[in-house]
């Protein structure tokens, strides 16, 4: 599988407390992957108890219970209580990966960042040159038409300009 991503992809860093439209305040369902849920269920001390009381659902279908559209673990300072008290390695998969996404297409895995995130948009717009892509196994950059060609796709020339 060939992984392809925008050149700015590895520069993405969550703005956390500086984010105006935090994903933690959008009343979204925040699913908890089962491996992380199991960590939460056996986590000792006050952080573990707080996390468990913030969870709902059963095995394979666990999620955080939103409170007034906010993640219950989002602190008033805009930072995540899980990270602050137990470390980033204890985030569930969706919180650790958002807004990153992956799409498989044939032999390609296309990675990107969702544009519902203000930092993703800022990164995309921070460069006045055309969007360039990278491949994990190569250090060279290539443009969108080259990516399409490598994937066996084509668009009319006028659609690419």
Describe each model-derived feature in a short phrase.
Residues 53:
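Metal-dependent nuclease catalytic cores that hydrolyze phosphodiester bonds in DNA/RNA
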Residues 1-22, 26-44, 56-68, 75-161:
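Short loop/turn segments that flank or connect secondary-structure elements
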